[in-house]
C-alpha cells in the first residue's frame, strides 16, 4: 500500500464513530480529506459538520455537507483529525497545515477525539517533526527568544498566515519527554496563541492505516 492508501484506509475507518443525526467535528489535512470524502457518502444521515479550517470547510461545502459555525453548536460527539506525530500515550504534534488553534478549539468541544494517521506518524518520542507555534505577528521575535530558552530552534514559516491572521514558528530539535508540561510552558509565553502539542487534550481513539489494514488503539 502507498502512504496515501494507508491514509485513505484510516479516514474511511473513522466513519464507524460517526453517529446518525449528529454534527461532526472535522479537522484538516491530507488524511482528513479522505475522511471528508467518506463522510459525504452519509451526509443524508448527519446534521452537518464543524470545521477547523477554511480548506476543510470549502471541501465539505463542495460535497454538499452542511458546515456550521462552532458558536452555534452546543456539543460535538466526535472530532476526527490527523496528526503529524503521535506517541503511545495519545499525545500529538499537530499544525503542519497551520490550523492548530482552530483544531485545538474544536477538539476541546468534542466528547471524543478520533485521530486518523498512516503508520509513519507513530513515534516513541515527540519532537522529530518540528513543533508549530502560532504567534501574534508583533510578538514573533520575542516568542522566538523564549523558545530558544526552552531548548528549541525556532524558524519563522515564511509566507504563511493562519486563518486567524497570525504567523507560525516551527520549533526544531526538541525531544519532548513531558508533552503536557511543555504545552503549558509554551502557551504561557506572552504572544503565543497556542502550540501544536495536543497533550492536555490528546486523542481518545487512534486509527492507524498500515499495509496490514487499520489498527485501532484506545
UniProtKB/Swiss-Prot annotation:
The active site is at 103 (proton acceptor). GO terms for biological process: D-ribose metabolic process; pentose-phosphate shunt, non-oxidative branch. Pathway: Carbohydrate degradation; pentose phosphate pathway; D-ribose 5-phosphate from D-ribulose 5-phosphate (non-oxidative stage): step 1/1. GO terms for cellular component: cytosol. It holds the Pfam family Rib_5-P_isom_A. It is an enzyme of class 5 (isomerase). The keyword Isomerase applies. Its EC number is 5.3.1.6. Keywords: Isomerase. Homodimer. Catalyzes the reversible conversion of ribose-5-phosphate to ribulose 5-phosphate. This is Ribose-5-phosphate isomerase A. It comes from Shewanella sediminis (strain HAW-EB3).
